[in-house]
């Protein structure tokens, strides 16, 4: 129908692969040679967000995946179109991507007085697309492993291969982190903590893959780590026991530290927010720094190109070796950051729980003796 044509066209535009012209690529390359390699722009361009997914270049043509733009302007209403209409600083439906100012790299709308207005932006950016893809991978892995366990009997041999590895990883997380840190009621929080671990781990690994569908710096985006930290914040405080809140507002300290000036309650109240803040910054900073270091080491090859063949050759060898080392280190960091975030979340949740008598079939540490 005619009414459906704009929507169909938008979807078609969104999934199309755009290709830059040869002349434009040549001009851009010439400009880069004259201005020198902009390492800062390369690094920030990778670790930042974008309205397209750049895949590389073939034969002088830039290949990128245009993502859908979905914004709502207070003056002109909703807009939905492909980001390819905004390439090269172009303006579409009164919208453009700002190149400077406080909204640099974001979609803005030009007002009648010449100022830029930032509309409500619900666009599917590179980070959002990577987040959706990686989340789908986590779901498929969990469903695939769960399917292997359906119909298994108690006397069946232990699973092997990927399923066996997955089971060992889950058991180690539950027995070594979740149960000891949370306590007797660990089963209540185990699904959330396991989900957080595998979500962060898969996103970290996918971020190290240099080509589509990897390469999106999801956990290096502070908005993503903020949501994860808020989720832990809610799990801690919404399910905290009355003893947890009593220790915050009326802890077992001398009375003069609580009244007339509530020194200790104020410190404890601030601690409620500093814990998730530490979770957010730790994950964000570590993942962003790892990506930045790898990119900078790679750029050393091109930065030293003008210093002569001897210098460039030696620095290229050093850069390649250090880059390989950093990539291997990032594989370890990808696991460690997921592990640390899960462990600290379990510790914070455990501190908010009442550790009384263990439940039937459980030890004081929280482990189920019947397993």
Language-model region placement:
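Perimembrane topogenic segments of multi-pass inner/organellar membrane proteins
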Residues: 1-160
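Cytosolic juxtamembrane amphipathic/interface segments immediately preceding
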Residues: 117-120, 171-186
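Alpha-helical transmembrane segments and their helix-start/interface "positive-inside/aromatic belt" motifs
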Residues: 123, 127, 187-192, 220-222
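Membrane-embedded alpha-helical core segments of multi-pass
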Residues: 137, 141, 170-174, 194, ...
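Juxtamembrane interface elements at the cytosolic ends of transmembrane helices
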Residues: 140-178, 240-247, 356-360
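Membrane-interfacial loop-to-helix junctions in multi-pass inner-membrane proteins
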Residues: 157-161, 181-191
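Hydrophobic alpha-helical transmembrane segments and adjacent short intramembrane/lumenal linkers
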Residues: 194-198, 202-209, 219, 223-227, ...
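Membrane-interface helix termini and inter-helical loops of multi-pass transporters
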Residues: 211-215
């Amino acid at each position: 129908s005619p009414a459906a044509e704009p929507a169909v066209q938008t979807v078609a535009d969104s999934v199309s692969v755009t290709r830059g012209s040869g002349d434009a690529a040549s001009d851009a390359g010439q400009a880069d040679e004259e201005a020198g390699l902009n390492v800062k722009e390369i690094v920030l361009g990778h670790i930042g967000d974008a309205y397209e997914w750049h895949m590389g270049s073939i034969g002088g043509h830039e290949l990128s995946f245009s993502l859908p733009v979905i914004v709502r302007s207070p003056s002109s209403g909703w807009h939905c179109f492909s980001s390819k209409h905004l390439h090269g600083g172009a303006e579409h439906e009164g919208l453009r991507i700002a190149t400077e100012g406080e909204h640099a790299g974001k979609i803005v709308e030009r007002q009648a007085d010449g100022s830029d207005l930032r509309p409500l932006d619900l666009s599917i950016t590179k980070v959002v697309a990577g987040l959706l893809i990686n989340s789908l991978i986590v779901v498929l892995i969990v469903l695939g492993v769960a399917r292997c366990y359906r119909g298994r009997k108690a006397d069946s041999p232990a699973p092997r291969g990927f399923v066996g590895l997955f089971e060992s990883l889950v058991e180690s997380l539950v027995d070594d982190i979740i149960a000891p840190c949370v306590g007797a009621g660990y089963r209540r929080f185990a699904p959330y903590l396991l989900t957080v671990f595998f979500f962060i781990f898969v996103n970290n690994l996918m971020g190290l893959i240099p080509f589509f569908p990897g390469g999106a710096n999801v956990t290096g985006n502070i908005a993503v780590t903020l949501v994860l930290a808020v989720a832990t914040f809610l799990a801690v405080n919404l399910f905290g026991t009355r003893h947890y809140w009593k220790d915050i507002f009326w802890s077992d300290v001398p009375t003069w530290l609580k009244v007339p000036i509530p020194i200790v309650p104020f410190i404890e109240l601030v601690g409620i927010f500093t814990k998730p803040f530490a979770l957010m910054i730790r994950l964000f900073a570590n993942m962003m720094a790892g990506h930045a270091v790898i990119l900078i080491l790679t750029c050393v090859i091109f930065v030293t190109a003008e210093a002569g063949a001897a210098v460039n050759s030696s620095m290229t060898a050093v850069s390649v070796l250090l880059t390989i080392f950093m990539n291997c280190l990032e594989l370890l960091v990808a696991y460690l950051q997921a592990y640390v975030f899960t462990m600290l979340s379990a510790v914070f949740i455990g501190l908010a729980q009442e550790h009384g008598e263990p439940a039937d079939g459980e030890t004081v540490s929280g482990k189920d003796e019947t397993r």
